[in-house]
Amino acid sequence: MNLTPLSALHYSSEQLACFLGACFEGYSVPVSLTPERFALRFGAEGISLTDSCVWWEGETLVAIAIITRRADTARLAAYALRPAYRGKGISKRLLAPLFERLREKGVRQLRLEVIADNSAGIGLYRALGFEQQRVLRGYQGATSSASGENVLRDVNPLELVWRAADEVKDTLPWQLDPLSLLTLPFQVYEYRRHAYAAVSTLMDTPSLRFIYVEPEYRGNGFAREMLTVLHHRFAGLSTPVAVPESFTPLFTQAGYSMMDIRQLEMRAVL
């Protein structure tokens, strides 16, 4: 089987969104993004078009890999094979050279997330040198909003990024890092002057992307109170399936339900 890799530089956001949807056909969690949402989502996550890749067999689409980068760390933000090519051991053949090229370009650490019940995917990534870091969850707020006093104040989104970025320093999952907020459509809300939340409107329902409580006010219930206020304010508010599982008590105490889906965060040192 002669497979040809081509850099994503050769394609538009419309084409890449189409390729991604085709390659995720039949997956337990299908991916379908409009060109605009593709560009906004992966642009915010730091897509590297030069490193992202589309594979072909002749004129037939085989697979796609979306790579995002920050300095010497890269992430496999999305990877999928067309249904006809699955179960044939192709992925390792495609990804190993891709990761080696990243190493040659100065990448020292690779990150990814994989659905927790995708045993084949987990086995593949372990064979490629990845190790599990933690379990990631998603949380769903109330499906209808409740009226009441508006205790949230709009603030300059950059205030939150400035406050949080230095403290976070790569300790959060990639999608929740405040650096991923900069080019997303989002608003930041302040609660009681010492707690902040970023809510994105990229998708059809609002998404809670980040919360931050000033260090000296932590342990006083600010985060739980703010989460409660937020899901009463925004109907259908949810998080990405990217929140470390250790935060489950905080979300459940604030009235959120835990989504059924889980992901594993994995990392490899090159």
Predicted regions, residues:
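A short beta-loop-alpha structural element at the N-terminal edge
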Residues: 2-18, 148-164
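Active-site rim helix/loop that mediates acceptor-substrate recognition in acyltransferases
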Residues: 18, 29-53, 57-66, 165-190
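Conserved beta-strand in the GNAT
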Residues: 54, 60-68, 75-80, 192-212
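Active-site acidic-Proline motif in GNAT/NAT acetyltransferases
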Residues: 69, 82-84, 88, 116-117, ...
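Conserved acetyl-CoA-binding loop-helix of GNAT-fold acetyltransferases
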Residues: 81, 87-100, 123-127, 219-232
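Conserved active-site alpha-helix within GNAT-family acetyltransferase domains
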Residues: 88, 92, 108, 116-134, ...
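Conserved GNAT acetyl-CoA-binding A-motif
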Residues: 102-113, 232-246
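C-terminal "cap" of GNAT-fold acetyltransferases
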Residues: 108, 115-117, 137-162, 260-270
